[in-house]
């Protein structure tokens, strides 16, 4: 099994790779307090729905460690406030709120513990969230590689690799699994404007893993589909609604429409923690609006005239009818998705409750 880079971990405090600096610089950030965790998520030092969920869980554990509360009840009050602050950083990715709620639930369920014992219990839960995420990613890889068995040219968008998770990735997991089995596979990597996660992160990850790749600009994808050089598309997700509508990085919907026009399957890979059964469909998913400077600049270099009007929705929603299959750690769901997604979430919850 190939080694994969760890994205976020605990070493007395939450530690993470500053993904804004990749691939030029591999820099480790140590978050010494809750505010630094919040800033790391908001500024996209850490990004990717599962990874920010793990980071938020560590943020809750850190808030407990740093709190001067002398009783468990006071600590619970501090944790509720920490959850609210963390949840507000990135509204589209449901894994964040899922992780902070899980941490709060554990705190409430263990409120009879002495306060120091409760702090340790919370850290153990955050570590469990991290470890379970990596295990889920590897399971996604094993399930998903079956769908890629006949695909030699796969297109992916944004970064849903190890950098977006605890390790190994979601959309890149089946690609890694095929490669580890010794089968040939080639990946078309969308650069993913405006933050360039594909160019900076996915291409770098695949290169590190020794997987054949070609970097393309986003507006080249249709050309390669038209030329018959794309066998399938696989992407991650930041939130999947109960009906199977998928929120993912801006540009995913456009790829889905193109895939439908060219009869190319579109696969979505995500852990069950990304499935939001409380959100009926994509229309109810909040779409984060990010900084205009991320559009007008690349790094510190301006590429547009000063003072122009800019729109920057960070995500779009792909309707369920454009999705061929959803790959989770519990298996593969096919349309219609609603009943299967509910069953998968229930199975995952039952498995977690038994640990």
Swiss-Prot record:
Protein keywords: Amino-acid biosynthesis, Isomerase, Methionine biosynthesis
Record has Membrane as a keyword: no
Enzyme class: isomerase
Task performed by this protein: Catalyzes the interconversion of methylthioribose-1-phosphate (MTR-1-P) into methylthioribulose-1-phosphate (MTRu-1-P).
Binding site for substrate: 47-49, 90, 197, 248-249
InterPro entries: IF-2B-related, IF-M1Pi, IF_2B-like_C, Initiation_fac_2B_a/b/d, M1Pi_N, NagB/RpiA_transferase-like
Origin species: Herpetosiphon aurantiacus (strain ATCC 23779 / DSM 785 / 114-95)
Protein name from the UniProt record: Methylthioribose-1-phosphate isomerase
Active site: 238 (proton donor)
PANTHER family: METHYLTHIORIBOSE-1-PHOSPHATE ISOMERASE (PTHR43475:SF1)
Annotated family: Belongs to the eIF-2B alpha/beta/delta subunits family. MtnA subfamily.
The enzyme's E.C. designation: 5.3.1.23
Catalytic reaction list: 5-(methylsulfanyl)-alpha-D-ribose 1-phosphate = 5-(methylsulfanyl)-D-ribulose 1-phosphate
Positions marked as site (Transition state stabilizer): 158
GO biological processes: L-methionine salvage from methylthioadenosine
Example of a GO MF term: S-methyl-5-thioribose-1-phosphate isomerase activity
Pathway: Amino-acid biosynthesis; L-methionine biosynthesis via salvage pathway; L-methionine from S-methyl-5-thio-alpha-D-ribose 1-phosphate: step 1/6
């Amino acid at each position: 099994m190939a080694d994969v880079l760890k994205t976020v971990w605990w070493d007395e405090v939450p530690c993470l790779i500053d993904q804004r600096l990749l691939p030029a610089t591999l820099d480790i950030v140590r978050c010494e307090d809750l505010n630094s965790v919040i800033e790391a998520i908001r500024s996209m030092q850490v990004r990717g729905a599962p990874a920010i969920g793990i980071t938020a869980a560590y943020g809750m554990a850190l808030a407990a460690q740093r709190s001067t509360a002398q009783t468990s009840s006071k600590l619970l009050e501090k944790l509720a406030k920490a959850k609210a602050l963390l949840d507000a950083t990135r509204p589209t990715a449901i894994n964040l709120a899922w992780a902070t709620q899980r941490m709060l639930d554990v705190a409430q369920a263990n409120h009879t513990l002495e306060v120091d014992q409760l702090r340790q219990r919370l850290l153990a839960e955050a570590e469990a969230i991290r470890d379970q995420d990596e295990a889920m990613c590897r399971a996604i890889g094993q399930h998903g590689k079956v769908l890629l068995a006949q695909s030699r040219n796969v297109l992916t968008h944004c970064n849903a690799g190890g950098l977006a998770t605890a390790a190994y990735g979601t959309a890149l997991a089946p690609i890694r699994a095929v490669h580890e089995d010794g089968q040939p596979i080639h990946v078309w990597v969308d650069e993913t404007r405006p933050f360039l996660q594909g160019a900076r992160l996915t291409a770098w990850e695949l290169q590190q893993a020794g997987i054949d790749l070609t970097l393309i600009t986003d507006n080249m994808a249709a050309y390669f589909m038209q030329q018959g050089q794309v066998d399938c598309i696989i992407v991650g997700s930041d939130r999947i609604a109960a009906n199977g509508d998928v929120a993912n990085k801006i540009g995913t919907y456009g790829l889905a429409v193109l895939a439908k026009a060219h009869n190319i399957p579109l696969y979505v890979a995500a852990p069950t923690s990304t499935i939001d059964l409380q959100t009926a469909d994509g229309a109810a998913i909040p779409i984060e609006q990010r900084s205009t400077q991320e559009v007008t600049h690349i790094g510190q270099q301006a590429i547009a005239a000063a003072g122009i009007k800019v729109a920057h929705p960070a995500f779009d929603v792909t309707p369920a009818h454009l999705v061929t299959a959803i790959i989770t750690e519990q298996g593969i769901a096919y349309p219609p998705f609603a009943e299967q997604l509910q069953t998968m979430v229930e199975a995952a919850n039952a498995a977690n409750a038994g640990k």
